[in-house]
UniProtKB/Swiss-Prot annotation:
InterPro entries: Ribosomal_uS4, Ribosomal_uS4_bac-type, Ribosomal_uS4_CS, Ribosomal_uS4_N, S4_RNA-bd, S4_RNA-bd_sf
GO biological process assignments: ribosomal small subunit biogenesis; translation
Record's signal peptide: none
Gene: rpsD
Protein keywords: Ribonucleoprotein, Ribosomal protein, RNA-binding, rRNA-binding
Official protein name in the record: Small ribosomal subunit protein uS4
Description of how the protein assembles with itself and partners: Part of the 30S ribosomal subunit. Contacts protein S5. The interaction surface between S4 and S5 is involved in control of translational fidelity.
Organism: Orientia tsutsugamushi (strain Ikeda) (Rickettsia tsutsugamushi)
Amino acid sequence: MTKVIKSKYKVSRRLGTSVWGHEKDAINNKNYKPGQQGNSSSVSKPSDYSKHLVAKQRLKSHYGRIPEKQFRNTFKIARKKSGNTAENLVGLLERRLDAVVYRLNIAPTIFAARQLVSHKHIKVNGKKINIASYRVKAGDSIELSEQAKQIPIVIGAISKKARRIPEYLAFDDEKFIGNFIRMPSSISEVPYPFDPQINLVVEFYSA
C-alpha cells in the first residue's frame, strides 16, 4: 500500500467514516481513530463544536481536501445566493470541474479527476480547462482529450460495470463526452458515501 493511500485511509479513520466510499477503506475494519488502541468504550463523547468541525472536514475531504480558504469562500457565495444555503453550497461544490469528472466516473478518485484537469486532459465546451475549481454550468459538455482516452485508469473507470452516474449528469461511452445537464435537485440526489450533514457545515461557518 502506497503512502498516499495510507494517508487517505487515515483521513477516513480520523473522521469516522469512509469519506470516498472505498470498499477497502481501513474504517471498514478499524472503526477507531489512528493512534487509538482498539475500539475503546472510554473515549469521551464529541462536543457540539467537534461534531460541526468533523462534518466540515468530511465534506472538504470528499471533494479532494479543498483548501480552507477556498472552501470558506465557496460557503460565502452560497450564503449570498437566494434559497437554501445548504443546497446552494452542495450545488457549488458539484459544479467544480474535478467533481464533475469524478461523478462522471471518468476517473476512479477525486484526486485522479483533479490530475486529469490539471494536466489539461479535460475540455469544457471544446476548450481545455486546467483549473479544478472551475465551475461548469447547465448545458456544458465535458470531453476527454485524445491522450486521456488511452490512460489505463480512465479506461478502467469507464469500463466498470457498476458505474453509477447521477441523474443531473450524462456520459456517452462511445464519444467520451459528458454533460452537466442541470443542478442537483436536492442534496439527497448527490451520491455521497456518507451522511454529509450539510446543515452542520452551514452552522459551523455561521457561528
